[in-house]
Amino acid sequence: MKLFEPGRIGRMLIKNRLVMAPMHVGGLIEPDGRLLQRCIDYYTARARGGVGLIISTPHSIRGEIKSYKMWMTGLSELSDAVHDYGVKVAVQLSAGQGRNVSTDYLRSVGAVGPSTLPCYFNPDLMTRELRIEEIQRLVQSFQFAAEVVSSAGIDAIELNCHYGYLADEFLTELWNKRTDRYGGDLEGRLRFPLEIIQAIKRGAGAEFPLSFRFGLTHYLEGGRSTEEGLLIARKVEAAGVHAIHVDAGCYETEYWGIPTVYLKPGCLVGLSEMVKKVVNIPVITVGKLGNPELAERVILEGKADFIALGRTLLADPEWPHKAKEGKFEDIRPCIGCENCLGRMRESKYISCAVNPMTGMEREFTVRQAKRARSILVVGGGPGGMEAARIAALRGHKVTLWEKGDALGGNLIPASVPEFKQEYRSLIKYLSVQIEKLGVNIELAKEATVEQIQAMNPDVVFIATGSMPIIPDLPGIEKGNVVAAIDLLLGKREAGQSVIVIGGGLVGCETALYLTQKGKKLTVVETLNDILRDTFRINRTHLQELLADAGIQVFTSTKVLEITDDGIIIADKYSEKKIKADTVVLAVGSKSDKNLSETLNGQIPHVYEVGDCLEPGKVINAIWDGFRKARLV
């Protein structure tokens, strides 16, 4: 595969075309930029997995050279650890977040920008415009930081100039309203990034490999156009950068910068292809490229020189080795749930819903058990399959009973819409792994207490999942009412006009799915907003898709009754009737505790796993199965 041929960025020879994209690591790094041992372990795992170049978490530039000298020890240890695997490492340097700082940071420290701008998370608060002498000190600080980075054995630097952060704000007319030499036309707006590039070269050396990360377009009215983006690409090439790392978006359109499940794989490749046509230096592309065949095709067709993988490598650090060996079925897929981001926004360390070891590589090592036991797992959903996988890895003799005719549990209906194809990949991955590990899988087998007692296992994991909640409403028994799960599984068909009761993720994705099948949709939610429990980026994108599809959404609205031809609803002002052929229920789920309650006290060493314990997300089920099986 061409994906595994060497490539160059400036003088730096990289063993393949795979780059670990820069991602914030949350609690794995100190606020002053020092790397914790867990951070080094995290990057080492990706180096061991076979990536060619690792680009670090962004390091914010502030203060004098003594501030950056504190980075030296951690960066030196990182470079040594990564180099042991023949992998190169770059440090991304950032001028800061500008108007995109968190509200807490904004209130305690404040925010600066090229101009006075409303802050993204709290538009009532404004950034302070940087003075020219502050800009010049900031530029000088990049030189200091580059000196430290290059002295620590790091192989390259990447300049963060994307996503609407401070350097990108200077570059963008929408946010840069200055009238001095750092504003105005493109030449003025480029001055700050170009001065940073020269400062990095003074600090690290003119030939020290330097990548420029920027968004070719913001996909935002008034933001950067692709035409201007191509001009910028040519100008930074002329300034001496050695590679251009192309993405898109900003906080207003962040589902482009961190592509959601609703965008197609390789959604940003067309942008890198445009840049390739106007520059003569390597171009790095990024964005939902976790399919090895797609990544290979991008390189073969000359649409980019390098493939950057971000969340893909959180899900499976061994992706490069598995792809090179053609073991595609062994690649654990990113499902695009964005819990990795959600947890960091809660001030936690970087993590992954489908890979509990991410960020805890040393602490969560799976070791052989001291004594092999017989283990029964009841339920073949994500929690049950993960428990079976880990138990088998530890050397236990594992049997899994699933009452249905296929593995997957609630992932099966969740994976029906085309935009949830990653969930199908997760089912396949888990199924293949437990089969390869020798788990005895019995389908169409509903467990009873008597059967479990007859088997007499040492340990039982109950992973029977959850079932839909059926609300107590007048008319709930009518023939036009169907649970979302039954509709997705094809047990029932929807009419041409459909009302979905419930504006959570299941309800809204079901509505989008039905709209794509040509149905007319209405969503009714009792809370004051839909998708309350969905992380911001997926939520924002899905809300826009629902609006674009013409789906009518009622919030702060109760359903009073289901009729033969629709429902009667009420808000605080009035009641009204909405007509529809079909009423879909998506008001949540409840744990299926029938077996666990029956087993209570009759069999020792019984553990509930996943939704059986408490309904939750994929992350809850998989992490629960992982942690409990790891301790048995």
Model-assigned labels for residue ranges:
Residues 510, 529-539, 609-632:
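A conserved FAD-binding loop/helix module that cradles the flavin
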Residues 28-29, 64, 167, 220, ...:
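Glycine/Thr-rich phosphate-binding loops of Rossmann-like dinucleotide-binding domains
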Residues 1-378, 382, 386, 390-393, ...:
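Flavin-dependent oxidoreductase catalytic cores
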Residues 289, 381-383, 406, 504-506, ...:
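Residue-level detector of alpha-helix initiation sites
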Residues 396-412, 519-531:
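Glycine-rich FAD pyrophosphate-binding loop
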